[in-house]
A protein has these predicted regions:
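Structured, basic alpha/beta domains of bacterial-type, RNA-associated proteins
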Residues: 1-150, 154
Length: 155
């Protein structure tokens, strides 16, 4: 019987599960949209809603509680400064889970969990790192070199 089962164990120990959700919460706050398996997304949804509700209180004790849960100063700052302002008139339902097909390797059901009214530019936070790497072709090789006629010398 499945009476009184409060949460999904996800085949992990309690410490592993706690670290997994801490990292997923930080990623969701940073990028505002992540792709994961459906059970993880369903388990993450109430956690992110509680974290955002705690961030909306914006007092010292809520900041300390957020930092103990997330352990990331940048995530706590974004929660309090950006997300709490965005959702100040919303009374819950800050995230949504959208089914996204099945994974190729193991046929696991995938889902996209995203924040409602998310900032689309938030996914492009780390794009600078990819752009700064030198390209394989240089601009000199792309341009055609002008051919100059070669004069043969007579003997």
């Amino acid at each position: 019987m499945r009476h009184k089962l409060g949460y999904r164990k996800l085949s992990r120990t309690s410490e592993h599960r706690k670290a997994l959700f801490k990292n997923m919460l930080n990623s969701l706050i940073k990028y505002e949209q992540i792709t994961t398996t459906l059970p993880k997304a369903k388990e993450l949804k109430p956690k992110i809603d509680k974290v955002i509700s705690l961030g909306k209180k914006n007092n010292l004790s809520s900041k300390k509680n957020l930092f103990t849960q997330l352990q990331s100063k940048t995530s706590v700052d974004k929660l309090i400064k950006v997300l709490s302002q965005r959702y100040e008139k919303r009374n819950g339902g800050y995230s949504r889970v959208i089914r996204a097909g099945y994974r190729y390797g193991d046929d696991a059901p995938l889902a996209v969990i995203e924040l409602v009214d998310r900032d689309i530019q938030a996914k492009k936070v780390d794009v600078k790192k990819k752009i700064e790497t030198p390209a394989k072709t240089t601009p000199e090789t792309k341009t055609k070199k002008e051919k100059t006629p070669i004069k043969k010398q007579s003997k």
